[in-house]
């Protein structure tokens, strides 16, 4: 590292080390004297001398030891002299959790203040010895990015469109172009510079290209995009260094391992990213200080040395990052995911930021990092980042959606992007001047950032026009961009870009040229530790698998019980082979669960891989190696339970040989399924790919169809099937035992019984085939793991693209044509220069709403209702993590005696810092909590709240926008309206109401857009948020709860949403919103405020007043609370003034002050008044629980499910392709064997073919339907809680939707298999084949749906379903015929659905065949009809009961699905 070591040493040459140390110690002492002033100077002098000696000793250490050894200050209590600051020598690589926490608590009491102090000291230390820090300047010149995409209806993912797209892509590969795609220009010829040491804010409306610009600068653009122009770092092109290691892109999507804690997540990130140049900097710094005789301050030295310590599992930098991001309070809480409670959304967003800033990277591109955070937390985080940028000369470009004015003022430079063009880039101080030159001015009580995001929009621009000399005309973005170039800031930027960056000026340590900054050994160790941790957290998964295999082993051992087994003839040997075969298959299937686990982990892996945390092999190797112990355990369990119980060859050597094969089968299967997961990458495709692969190795393993019978065109596949070797090895190991080889096949035969059996199964006779099998399985395991690693390395996640349906579509047509939309957008054009939302106050709400026009769409009648609640408390069971830390209480209280009221026509804001209990309170009041303990009184207009009736008159907009992904925006609203509006409202009226609500929230241009999955496809975050609100508004509720309706929105979108909310309130509805970081105008759109502090306590409840004067006056009335600065956001000031830091500073508890205030007494009186019903009022009553009757609910649910299924090609198309592939495989492998009736073996092969087809198509149907049902179930929980419908109509509609798709699947499957296998072409036989296949596929599908309804998530459903695959297989009648099943298990044969399927298929095809066939073991020849009756127990006249039972299984599984959907709720809130 180039730190100019040839500079002359600083300081006088004759200064002694001892004197230098003394000076420095006395300097350090003065700095800490304020804190520890109680100690005497005499004692402090002694301490100084001791400390000086310690520093002298450290200076004498070898460099390696010296750079990891320092002094740590600690407070020591002394009875004589009081608290003393003592120092102890520590090794920074061995700091324990307590030491790290003490240091952080002592040095960083108030995060932003102490952060600046320590960083200033750190910078002064570096500057003192003349070291220049490495910096990065990022330039982009003439950058243009384009994408090709489908538009309109062609962009919808219907089955038809997907088939067309696949066909066009295939033709495109051979040069035939049919596809007509639109070209979208995302960024258009933009140029600029991101400078080090300056905070740069990226602003722009949604879809303006902000994320694309950040990704481009970070070198992470999708390769399918067309890019032109140059991006350079310090003059280097992106291909000349490693941009993904030099810079870090912090995504707006939060992808984390849900079962890791916050601290574990950041520690792992810190280990993978390493320390970068910190160690080299420290080394050079220490050398120069030693030469100059300079002694560092202890806290700075410890911080720098701990930050530069490589290979530590728990880094001090992690504790520092947790502190400055405000995550220290939840550091030991798991992050959580969709189905597992963890940290809040805002905290999760901070974890995403912390994951990157914990590393050494100083060039950060941060994408909307404040979503879900309150404004004071955002300010604190941005303030700390600003200090890092200014004092460490970092390079930061950050996009924020709604930066408060005080946060906006922290930035030095602004980049404003709109429609893919740069409108302005330069100093913050000049940006308003630029727009004033056009005639636009930012109003006084309007945040500059909000103004900037609205002023370029056609719908919002006019209200800011202030030029009285000329009339307003719309100024397009292109004109702003053009005029910027001639503006003095733009000219300066152009001049700067005209001079190329001088590479010699750049520090060579600024850029990273190595792909990984940590040694491969250390990366492997980090991934190993993480994998081991995840195994411990996933203990249930491994215990479940082991218990599952023990249960199946117990069933198997009692089914093939040794007392019932003989070794007399070939028939007996076949039973042993059946047991071996089942054991092989069950241990193969055991690996199937690995696939679901791996698919769920891939998104986080791809993120970390692309951030160059670690190479793929360091992920795959620990996964493989740590899977070995669980395989040994499961294999041992299987062998111990089955081997001697069944009565296999009693030699100990054969026991251990079979154990080795079973273990290798498990390892091979787990490796194979991990490979399939990494290649397929989504659960639906992986389930199909897994089943298809399993079918291939299953069919061609030599046991369903002996080697000699396999058609020539499939002969090669026999040798590449792992099960070939597994089967050969198992059979050879058993059949070469003396008990088989010491007997003749029959009394008149010269062939040994074992040899005869091997001949019949076409297995090789050589003993060495056992070791060939072992070697082959080892090779397959190694091969699959290598391919798994390669797939992880080179394949990218399967991303779906949204169709191009521009938000500003046909804007010219909109202007002047749609008065309602124009009035909503401008909120009265006559008030130019004023803030529309700010004017929507208590006194002028009706005036500012623009008259009745704005209320169009909210005119359906409703009853205004008030809600009052008194002394509401909420408890949950004490989390295990807290009990582990010594907390003795059994319950954790989240709400502490909350009292208040929400009234009609009054818009109430529910505010507080993250973790204050805002969402918890709303969930409790709305009746959305599924667990915990609620106390207190909640009333609706004086009557006790009854949840069933309350759901009919209330709406709840959740913080997470949960919608069915495959329907359009308009369809989502139609569905909500038709189910929730009263029956008396006609269809036309409902449709009109839906259209009006769409206009109200400005979704009309997106009416035909697919909703999609968040972060994957479909609507953007802000569009999804507006849809959530619209879905509730179309229900026409009296009371509406909105959980952070503006979170994740930019200022313009937030204003649109709040206009819709305000219009809703002005109709007389009761509306309550939790809100995190409101701008001034949005905050002052509210009428009343309920403010909460952490711990679930109210600290203010009352009116805001004009310009928020009432809430400001309330807090300013307390002694010590500073006055609000001029033009400061009152929401931010209020949160700061009442923060925990402020309470500590003032030594007050604002909750206690509120409880003692007159305001609290007035609220108590109001609640008391509202708790008594008005005279003559009656309680809420509805004749029925739901708006629609059961038939109406069913029709609506079926309508939505139909569209969902039609637009789910990754489900329906994938299973259709799988069934087609299975049909062709079965047909080509068992080509025309249906007509072979010479011996019993031919019949066994046919049964094997039909059994395999039904099992594999059925299992595929089961596994592919699970993700579909799981996604829709999450939506179902929201819709049922909203009172849309009951569970039964929903469940029956989903069951009904499967019928036509399974019918299509069955018809073409039957035609292909029936013809290619060569069954008899008789109408009756073909009908029964189709009938049995149809109901078999159907019951498998419903079985998959049932398993999801019984379990909390898809992963557990997959494991649960697979638990019964083995039992269904075992009792199917293939491995052990019914007459051979012991009497104590025969009952299960009759309740096994697969057994009835095999029964029906065989009887329908062979029950009337009188052809005589040769029977094994020298028995007399029988007719086919007699043979299947004697050997399998299949009676030809039993087809009627078979048909009835198959229908019964189908109905039973569907019923259990519906019943569980109705009764079980796995959502934890």
Curated annotation (Swiss-Prot):
The modification Phosphothreonine is found at residue 43. The record marks 704 as: Required for preinvasive defense to nonadapted powdery mildews but not for salicylic acid (SA)- and microbe-associated molecular patterns (MAMPs)- dependent defense against host-adapted pathogens. Involved in defense responses toward necrotrophic pathogens. Not necessary to prevent the sensitivity to IBA (an auxin precursor). GO terms for molecular function: ABC-type transporter activity; ATP binding; ATP hydrolysis activity; auxin efflux transmembrane transporter activity; cadmium ion transmembrane transporter activity; efflux transmembrane transporter activity; mRNA binding. Changing residue 915 to S: In pen3-2; overaccumulation in leaves of 4-O-beta-D-glucosyl-indol-3-yl formamide (4OGlcI3F) upon Blumeria graminis conidiospore inoculation, a pathogen-inducible tryptophan-derived compound, which biosynthesis is dependent on the PEN2 metabolic pathway. ATP 1 binds at residues 204-211. ATP 2 binds at residues 912-919. GO terms for cellular component: chloroplast; chloroplast envelope; endoplasmic reticulum; endoplasmic reticulum membrane; mitochondrion; plant-type vacuole; plasma membrane; trans-Golgi network. This is ABC transporter G family member 36. The gene is ABCG36.
